[in-house]
Amino acid sequence: IETFAEGFLLTRDSMEWFRGQYLPDSERWHDPAASPLYADVTGVAPALVFTGGFDPLRDEGRAYAAKLAEAGVPVVDRCFDDQIHGFYNIAITRSSVAASDEINHTVGAALRGDLAW
């Protein structure tokens, strides 16, 4: 993780700490049971993938969405270019509130069955 690894709330050091808490055995970091990026996603449920443009995890999220699409899984892949990691939970700017509203609308449409995948 190089892009946006510092200065945008979530840092490389904090992500490494979280990964160590989640999966201390580095031999398992690419285990399909630990990360869907390494799993067969054929036939999984439709997915909504929302990322922030300044999120160090953006590329990972977008790669997952692409993997789903390549497997024929219905997916909405939406990157909010001007947002950081956690923007949905800390919606304190006009743009983050607007992004959160769009997410809420999309999730609601998906739950109602009104989303055009």
Describe the role of every protein-language-model region.
Residues I1-W117:
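Alpha/beta-hydrolase superfamily serine-hydrolase fold, recognizing
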